[in-house]
């Protein structure tokens, strides 16, 4: 089989159409064209053509991978998954990854280190969440352990406290005890240890005093009483107390406040 003509593709000047015996047969990247010295008149066997096509697949995949990496640093697993979605053959994926590694495009430790630092600074995530994300990205336990060590206890407490302050602002209608429990639960879900979550909850709510809680209780009593005024006095009182207890106020605190402020559920005559 002889190459009878070669033409540049109109939409991609770096790719060439190869015609064998006057018929289009395949296309190749410019680098593959030069490597195999493809030119008019060259004779190729079926095995030659198959080898060239495989080399072109690797080259095409390599170009796609480099473009994929141009947006941000990726782990080896992320690149492998991307190439699979591009329907690359397994042999091509392995070859592409080797080439990328030789070109210093892949370094899982550097990726993990950069990813961890970014998450610490920009997302305030806890170490367990970051560890889980690194596992999903295909990093080894050894690499994960090394980079997580850089997340100091001081930085964890600082980030957890910042998260706690945000949680507190969103839940400023609850009693201090309930608020602290909410903070602890949310922080554990965000990847912090229970011990550190408790410390952050204590730190975030440290400035809440009895007066603050009394003010919150007053507002909640007024709001709940308005909501329940359509009920009989005894039912309205019970519903109000139940609602307040669900927000973390103790029964004794509620009763004391009602008594001290002479709040009655009886209808005014």
Curated annotation (Swiss-Prot):
What residue stretch is flagged as signal peptide? none
Can you say where in the cell this protein is located? Answer: Cytoplasm
Record's Pfam families?
RecX_HTH1, RecX_HTH2, RecX_HTH3
State a GO cellular component annotated for this protein: cytoplasm
Q: What is its main location?
A: cytoplasm
Keyword Cytoplasm among record annotations: yes
4Fe-4S among keywords: no
According to UniProt, the name of this protein is Regulatory protein RecX
Gene for this chain: recX
| Keywords linked to the UniProt accession | Cytoplasm
Give the family from UniProt. Answer: Belongs to the RecX family.
């Amino acid at each position: 089989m002889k190459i009878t003509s070669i033409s540049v593709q109109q939409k991609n000047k770096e790719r060439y159409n190869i015609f064998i015996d006057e018929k289009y047969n395949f296309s190749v990247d410019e680098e593959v064209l030069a490597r195999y010295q493809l030119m008019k008149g060259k004779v190729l066997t079926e095995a030659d053509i198959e080898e060239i096509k495989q080399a072109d697949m690797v080259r095409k995949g390599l170009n796609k991978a480099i473009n994929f990496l141009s947006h941000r640093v990726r782990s080896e697993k992320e690149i492998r998954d991307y190439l699979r979605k591009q329907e690359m053959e397994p042999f091509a994926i392995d070859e592409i990854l080797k080439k990328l590694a030789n070109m210093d495009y892949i370094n899982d430790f550097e990726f993990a280190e950069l990813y961890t630092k970014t998450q610490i600074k920009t997302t305030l995530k806890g170490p367990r969440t970051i560890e889980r994300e690194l596992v999903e990205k295909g990093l080894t336990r050894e690499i994960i352990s090394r980079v997580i060590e850089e997340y100091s206890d001081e930085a964890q407490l600082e980030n957890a406290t910042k998260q706690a302050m945000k949680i507190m602002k969103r839940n400023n209608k609850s009693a201090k005890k309930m608020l602290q429990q909410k903070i602890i639960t949310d922080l554990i879900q965000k990847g912090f240890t229970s011990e550190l979550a408790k410390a952050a909850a204590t730190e975030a709510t440290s400035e809440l005093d009895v007066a603050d809680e009394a003010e919150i209780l007053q507002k909640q009593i007024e709001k709940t009483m308005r909501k329940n005024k359509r009920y009989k006095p005894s039912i309205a009182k019970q519903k109000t107390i139940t609602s307040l207890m669900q927000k973390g106020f103790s029964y004794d605190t509620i009763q004391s406040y009602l008594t001290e402020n002479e709040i009655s559920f009886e209808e005014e005559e």
